[in-house]
Regions:
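A conserved amphipathic helix/loop scaffold
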Residues: 70-167
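Aromatic-Pro/Gly-enriched surface loop or interdomain linker
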Residues: 1-63
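Generic beta-strand/beta-sheet core signal
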Residues: 13-15, 55, 69-70, 94-96
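Generic preference for well-ordered secondary structure
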Residues: 29, 36, 51, 67, ...
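Active-site and adjacent substrate-binding regions of carbohydrate-active enzymes
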Residues: 59-73
Length: 167
């Protein structure tokens, strides 16, 4: 209806500089494609009847109940600070594969992956492991039960000593 508005409670983070940097040839895998990540998430919520906004990682995220960064390979210090603020204020946040790997100059952050957000996530990638185009790995919970599969990409995660596993 003309003039009407929607108030989305879900946002997908989109940063053009990060998209461009992710898809350079020098990355560990050419299978990581921002468009695919975004469409997979968007399609899922659309089919369930949810309205979804696209938001820049530096904009105010406090109005959302759920913010998803399907991939945010390159993140400015301002974006990292803004994500911290959103999570600290109670926004639910999902961070996808190979995210917050480098700063705005494509420099690896001193201290390693997710150094500025490890305390909030309770985990970080210790090692990235791109898979072959037809490769897949099993996802298992702490009891060893199969809960899914991943194709194209895997990450070896390190948990914080006080982190609670909920999967």
């Amino acid at each position: 209806v003309v003039g009407s508005t929607t108030n989305s409670e879900i946002a997908l983070l989109l940063d053009w500089n990060s998209w461009w940097a992710l898809e350079l040839d020098s990355r560990p895998s050419t299978l990581l494609r921002q468009r695919t990540f975004l469409l997979d998430y968007y399609r899922h919520f659309f089919e369930l009847g949810y309205s979804v906004d696209f938001a820049h990682p530096e904009q105010d995220l406090s109005k959302y109940k759920l913010v998803i960064a399907p991939n945010l390979y390159l993140a400015t210090d301002k974006a990292v600070s803004n994500i911290r603020k959103a999570i600290s204020s109670g926004v639910n946040f999902v961070l996808g594969a190979f995210s917050i790997a480098v700063d705005e100059d494509e420099g690896v952050r001193p201290g390693g992956h997710l150094i500025d957000l490890r305390d909030l996530f309770g985990a970080y990638s210790e090692e990235w492991s791109p898979l072959y185009a037809d490769g897949a790995v099993n996802l298992v919970d702490s009891s060893g039960k199969l809960v899914g599969k991943s194709d194209g990409w895997a990450e070896y995660m390190k948990l914080a000593p006080d982190a609670e596993v909920v999967l």
